[in-house]
């Protein structure tokens, strides 16, 4: 399960409570993964340059995640975007995160890839109308 940073502690506590009386366990793998967001109208084109996986709309619909080969390693690839454009979040293991990041930068150079800060992404999120737990809604809101 991938959860927003603002909801991490609450999600983990809820899952642990739910699993107490069951034959299940909760393991927090946060420290073992990095997050690299590739967002924008050419994100699919960029991603196709760094993976042999099919990243077409038919192969990976919005909201779906799967493991893909990328930059001599593997990463979870989640098709999601909070900026109002096509986008993907890559979750490589920590040991290949720098390699994946470098591959993204190299593949996006001629596509006009730019770094975007948190406030820029947040502004795009607001324009799109996506609500964010901890900013726009809280634990008592029912979106």
What are these regions (language model features)?
Residues 2-143:
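Conserved, structured C-terminal
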